[in-house]
Amino acid sequence: MSNLKMKEAALIYLDRSGGLQKFIDDCKYYNDSKQSYAVYRFKILINPSDVVELDAELGNHILHQPLKAAEVFQSVCFIAVKTLSLIGQLQTETQINIVLKLTHLPPLPSYGLDLCEFPLDYTSQRFYMMQGIVIAMTTITKYTQGARFLCSDEACPLSKGFQYIRVHVPGATESATIRNDFLCNLCASSLQEDRKFRVLGDKQIVEIIATKALRAFQGYSNNQPFRFQSLTIFLRDESVNKMNIGNEYKIIGIPTCVKTSQTAVCIEANSITFCNSKVPSGISDNFRCLLSLTSSSCWKFTAILANIFASQITPPGTYNLLKLCLLMSLVQTTDRNKELEDCLDILIITSDTLLIDRLLNFSINLVPRGIRHLVSTEIFPTLSRNKYGTGAVSIQAGSALLAKGGICFIGDLASHKKDKLEQLQTVLESRSITVYIPGKKFGEDIDQQMTFPVQCSFWSFVDVDSSSRRNAQKINTLIGQMDCSLIPANLVEAFGLLINCNESSPCHPFLPTVQHTLNKAINPEGLFYAASRQFTTEDFEKLLAFAKNLNVEFSLEAERMTHGYYLASRRIRTGSVCGSKLSASALKYLVFLSEAHARLNLRNKVLKEDVLIAALLFETSLTLKYGATVFCVAPNAVFPFELYNEEYLEQRDLYLTQCQQQLEQFIATYGPGTTIFSSDE
């Protein structure tokens, strides 16, 4: 096909797609402007499928020779401007800068760039699609979008006019646009830039890793090798600030090689789309059957879930309280692009750190964004110099931002330094982290600061044996209060749930754990319990993925009970000297716990039975922090019996019903102005 035919096809596409009208509107803006322009920039939205259907050769040019395709549209647009007299000041075709923005690429393997596979096909300068998570980003800097050059010889006719226009093209460096060694084609004299016509644009550099590479941050290995490498993405103009650290995106762009200390493969982004993970349509048949069998009770299903959860790590029936809290925290994670505020942070007091570490590490692998923080790395963002020499500061994500919408497991609190623990406390209280950028250090005139939302739940544990060795045990004057002298009291308060899992607690049966450990040592891959074979890890992954996407709302009874318990607890835990021990976030945390229990039951409505579990868990945590009060809750209130069969589940339901009556009485006594309705009313 001749070049003329392709231009004709381009014009037809612009007319049919509405691009021609948008082009005319943009021209009107330039024509009405009082400013003089050397370069007129136009953005054209291209749907490759529509173009290929209209004209195969033009479509092929767009997909595989995008720079030549841009020249075709440039010629068409120049003819349109001259024919319709759209811009009076326009003199030459080179003044028109066409940017083709693609809506998508064909879903074929040859158009994908997998960062975990080698080698990468980056030699052909055409469009590819890649998917990844942002792990670093720079501040915004300027680049030269376009410039006007004139011949230095005043006698040369090209010392005037707009014959020498240079614009940025994908993959080009700054020196390709602005240099001092350009020569005149007519007289071979050097060209000089007319600086008053230089056009600047915004530029930002981000680094992404493939989603599969998150396995390196999850503390789990299936002995399958994979390639781990970050890829640098250049964002320009309207693409700037469209990517956030921790989010996952699909990126269409053109690969290029940039030479720093070594040659690096980079991508010039053309279009960016946020990735929303697919919501599973349901749960496994085994869980569906279990849900049906326990439908008569609001408590049985979650009790059985906690009982059989992580049977590969710890035998069924052990650590039920902790496992229920872990499941509730997992079900509050999200894969959506929304602010995650309903985080459930968990701090565990234990003497068996190895088993707790394994249990938590197993749990974070059940959600897409479960991150195991390594002590050698940073929890929160850090600053470094940009390796591409653009003068921008590079902000590295850290484990917390990488765990966006998920869980950040930070290990033993005692392994972190004092300043990091203070930073953690601030983040737990504010749910944000502010990064200060000293201008003097990074070559800027002024200091800057950037604030990032921290949208993940934090899990950690404290070794009580370590605490007793380093600090003398303090004598607790309050019943039920736990010795947490190793860590600052304010940090303990910042964690929503404090769970006791030491040898003196009812959730630490000794003999079954020893037997399980010995069996695992003999047969690491063995499944020793019927629950492990009937309810697999994949079943739990599917259950959590389905449950966390449920939209839940409070019933009137549940809402009143939540507010009533909060007011009553705040009243009895208020001292004359230090005021209330309940923080302002306590009510919010009770709401999150209630929602989590409802989601785990696969319900869309929060009932007062969910609020009871939330209140018992929260009161147990408060007792460990501050000691018992009038509403005295046993340490094993949520799991008063070992769950062996249906009879024990029925006994637990009766016990929890009594607890609910006690809670209602407590609210009626200490929560004035709060009405609690009985089922009859």
From Swiss-Prot:
One of its GO terms (biological process) is double-strand break repair via break-induced replication. InterPro entries: MCM, MCM_lid, P-loop_NTPase. Keywords: DNA damage, DNA repair, Meiosis, Phosphoprotein. Disulfide bonds: none annotated. Gene3D superfamilies: P-loop containing nucleotide triphosphate hydrolases. One of its GO terms (molecular function) is DNA binding. The keyword DNA repair applies. Residues 533-621 form the MCM domain. Plays an important role in meiotic recombination and associated DNA double-strand break repair. This is Minichromosome maintenance domain-containing protein 2. It comes from Homo sapiens (Human). The gene is MCMDC2.
